[in-house]
Amino acid sequence: KTNYRASLNYKKNDGMIRNTSRETINGSIAVNHRAFDDKLQLSFNLANSFVKVDAVSDDVDKVGDIPNYGILYQAIRINPTMPIYKEDGSFWETYSGYEDFNPVARIYQRTKKKEFKNLLANFKAQYEIIPGLTAAAFFAMEKNDALTNDYSMREEYSQYKDGTNGRAKKEYYQNTNRTTEWTANYNTSINGVHNITGLLGYSYQDFEYEQFSAENKNFLTDVFGTNNLEAGGYLKDGKAEMKSKKETSKLIAFFARANYNYDGKYMASASIRREGSTKFGANNKWAWFPSVSAGWMISREDFMESQEVFDVLKFRAGFGITGSLPTDPYMSLATYGTGAGAWNAYTGSWLTATYGPNINPNPDLKWEKNESLNIGFDFGLLGGRLNGTIDWYSRTTRDLISSYNAQQPSLIYNTITTNVGTMRNRGIELALNAEVVKTKDFSYTANFTFSYENNKLTSLSNDVYKSSYEDQYDLPSPGNPGKAYRLQEGQPIASFFGYVCDGINP
């Protein structure tokens, strides 16, 4: 038995800013096959998408010391009486000491064209060895790549003001994720009331990321855009920029899970995972992650038969530990680089720094662990017309991964990435679903949700690394009070600190 499905979709949307659009093509195919009296099941899925974006190069950058926050920001803050065009039809620009560029001019003088490709393919084979016992193999690959062409014309505000006469940049990245998973699943029922399922498995994930970019400035013409990077004068002067990098990491897991259900009244589940990642130090790549949960369908008990309030009433509780991965795959290793170098005005060339350490190694870097405790009730009343859930939870994150000042000597670099700190989240969640009106021809339902959470950074220090708070971000001008966002022990994440105003000086 074989069945298949295929789809193709095309969509184009124009942006709210002139000369901007997004064009998308999506295609997919799915094939399923059964054989040997349905004991063997095969499935294959393939999905591909192509996206083309015409945008405005509107990244946050700087002209001199003045930040540029983009076209929409500039359209709001600029003098509304400033003209858009000069009498000769060219764009009006003030070239003042402030970043008061013409937002309409930027639409036409800066372009950013992006092309995205996404490929997702997976294959699964499952075979029933004996009744109740199945084995499965799963293979998947996801591949994303993007090409960006970014060009600023010679007369564009920042180029003309800085005398750089045009800027062209090409950037490409590719992200690949491969997954292999093997599982064995067993389920059985004893006397129709004892229902048992079990799972054993192994998974392997491989991540690979590559990026390349090249940028040049000082062009004689805008005709070529980003298609003739070598024509820019910065390349001859040794000031053109090129960057590339490649990152790889692996994640391996062994796991097991068991579920038990007695006659729909009592439920219990337990699982264990042993996971290892190349992102952690040599001494702590592996960690255990257990979980347990239980449920009690109170409304099915004999003593509940005489009551008429609850149609459904279920109690449940669970506790589990999960792990978090750092974003950078090399935080535990000693990496080296040349630094940014410097421009030598006397020789007219770049001075390149020699190779030196970028970070200190930490062979003891380990998993962040998230401990979660959840207790809740599910209920139904009024013949099923009112249903809801209520939950209380407590989540504690231990061994937070962060950067701390390092002792010099003996360490080479002045900071180190390590595990310090604890954060706690506690809260209540309530969800209600009511069938307010239900007739033959009309029905009306209402939903209500409520949540409350208390967050606290309980610790930022240990016996070796000390910190009571860490300043993060500034507030924007005017009236910048300095660092206003702070991580501080005993306070919630995202706490704001600033001067206390006593009033206005008359």
Regions found by a protein language model. Name each.
Residues 27-32, 288-296:
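Feature captures outer-membrane beta-barrel proteins of Gram-negative bacteria and organelles
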Residues 8-12, 268-277, 319, 435-436:
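Transmembrane beta-strand segments that form the barrel wall of outer-membrane beta-barrel proteins
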Residues 1-20:
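Short strand-turn segments of transmembrane beta-barrel domains in outer membranes
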Residues 121-127, 139-143, 379-381:
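Alpha-helical support elements that line or immediately flank enzyme active sites
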Residues 16-17, 26-118, 138-252, 300-371, ...:
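Surface-exposed loop/interface segments of Gram-negative outer-membrane beta-barrel transport/assembly proteins
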